[in-house]
């Protein structure tokens, strides 16, 4: 079952060039999946009761164009499959006219937060999301060979505002910090 919401690009989400930033895009995608989970009764409070969380394992994001300040956008997400403890989810961001701005493929692990181990999501959960086919986009290989680094970066502190409800660094915050 696909889920969408519409918004406008805010001043607080843009960079010097007047366009949405990558962390801003990731926030939209992440918020869309959270809104869907809340709408189907699988939201933050329900997961907390179960002692579980969906934890991002991998992103593949294609950006065709970053939207600009004030531009109206539609963000859509859907589950594209479940296998064991993994959930596959796709995202799109489009203009009002249907121009594809960005899309993403993601893999999430359903984790028992007490043990830290992945566990199979309950059937009621996977049924609630339903499955729509995967996005028609060639994301290429998921594993990227890291180039040799000629420097070691400086360590940076993780502050309370970087943490999410799972007490982990939020996905978009991580990108901003790195």
What are these regions (language model features)?
Residues 1-76, 80-178:
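Terminal targeting signals and extreme-terminal segments of soluble enzymes
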């Amino acid at each position: 079952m696909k889920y969408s919401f519409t918004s406008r690009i805010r001043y607080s989400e843009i960079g010097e060039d007047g366009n949405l930033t990558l962390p801003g895009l990731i926030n939209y995608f992440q918020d869309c999946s959270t809104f869907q989970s809340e709408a189907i009764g699988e939201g933050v409070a329900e997961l907390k009761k179960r002692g579980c969380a969906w934890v991002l394992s991998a992103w593949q994001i294609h950006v065709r164009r970053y939207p600009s300040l004030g531009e109206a956008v539609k963000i859509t997400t859907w589950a594209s499959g479940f296998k064991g403890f993994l959930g596959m989810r796709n995202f799109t961001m489009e203009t009002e006219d249907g121009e594809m701005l960005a899309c993403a493929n993601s893999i999430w692990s359903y984790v028992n937060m007490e043990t830290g181990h992945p566990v199979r999501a309950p059937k009621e959960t996977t049924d609630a999301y339903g499955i729509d086919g995967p996005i028609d986009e060639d994301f290429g290989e998921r594993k990227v060979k890291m180039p040799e680094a000629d420097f070691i970066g400086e360590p940076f502190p993780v502050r309370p505002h970087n943490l999410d409800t799972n007490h982990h660094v939020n996905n978009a915050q991580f990108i901003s910090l790195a």
